[in-house]
Amino acid sequence: NKSANIFLVHESVYDHTYNVLLTRARPLGITLKRFDSYNPEFTNSIFGMLIQLPGQNGDLFNPSFLISKAHKKDISVCASIDPLAQVLIKPIAHFGVDIAIGSMQRFGVPVGFGGPHAAFFACNERFRRLIPGRIVGETISKDGEKSLRLALQTREQHIRREKATSNICTAQSLLAIISSFYAVYHGCEGLNNIARNLVILRSYLEQGLYKLGFIINKDVRFDSIDVYSSKSVEVHKSAIKNGFNLRILPLGSDINNSTGFGISLDELSNIDEIHKILDFIADAINKNIDFEEIPKDNLFNLNGIPLREKKFLQQNVFENYRSETDLMRYIFSLAEKDFSLVDGMIPLG
């Protein structure tokens, strides 16, 4: 339907992502509409939809019905995903999405006040010639060995300038390499441990907040918690005093008129950090907390969303480098194969 001009954006999508979409959509005559239902009404004027897993408040939902319903109306579905969450949940492609996007910041790259971070982009066969950038594929060399070459002609020389896609994205090569070696170092087992630990710590934090009398909704969550409370102003002030930066809820408000707070954990979070958080929250509401009373059994809980069944990263390279010395030697061996301006001139084109 070429007359369709509405693109749906789920409420789970980060606000800053939505603002970027607005900037791109306006000059193209595309109307963005946010929706918060898991069973929206799809009209003929809608051509696409963006969802996010986990959502901006950490919630994980099963998008199967939503995606299936969209496809029946010939609506393309794009998913913004967290690679660390993908370690645990069913691969996003198996849900039937058409396009998957995301940031690799999770894999060994500090937050850095917003970036830069390497992005990733994947799509089904239908959109392969619309992928931005230059696509490298595997082939066989004249000597019968595996080799890499540019696989799709997305360059300006072959396509009318306004439809060329090779020059509409920026290569964050160094950051992509850092994230790749993070996966090489940890492998399937290590990444699984990191992701599972995040879920367990988040669940433990939830149990501690319950003990302090807070009410938290029962959504399935990965690494984040949203709490609404009449004591949120006091909690925010106590957090700042103790060196923590909590999310101010609702979005767009400031500390003095906030009605809630959000907490997000990451790969560096540990039990000591959780205890510090619970301590300053307890102090803010004039209560005491006994960590021995917090339940510690069955903390890994992602009920309601299909989990990954098969192992991933099974190539030898993700199994062989578990010490820093081995990894350093491997990186250097690859660097020695590189040809750069250090070695000679590189012709353009």
PLM regions with names:
Residues N1-S147, L209, G213, D226-V227, ...:
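Conserved PLP-enzyme active-site core in the AAT-like
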Residues K2-S3, I46, I99-G102, T154-R161, ...:
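Short acidic (Asp/Glu) and glycine-rich catalytic loops that position anionic groups and cofactors
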Residues L8, G260-D266, F312-Q314:
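Short glycine-rich or small-residue beta-strand-to-loop segments that form or flank ligand, phosphate
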Residues L8, H16, V20, G58-F61, ...:
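Generic recognition of stable, solvent-exposed alpha-helical segments in well-folded globular domains
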Residues E11, Y38-E41, V87, I135-G144, ...:
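A glycine-rich phosphate-binding loop feature that marks nucleotide/adenosyl-phosphate handling sites
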Residues S64, S68, I271-P347:
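Flexible inter-domain linker/hinge segments
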Residues F107-G208, L212, I216-D219:
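Active-site C-terminal subdomain of aminotransferase-like
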Residues E189-F280, I289, M328, F332-E336, ...:
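Conserved C-terminal alpha-helix-loop-beta "cap" of PLP-dependent enzymes
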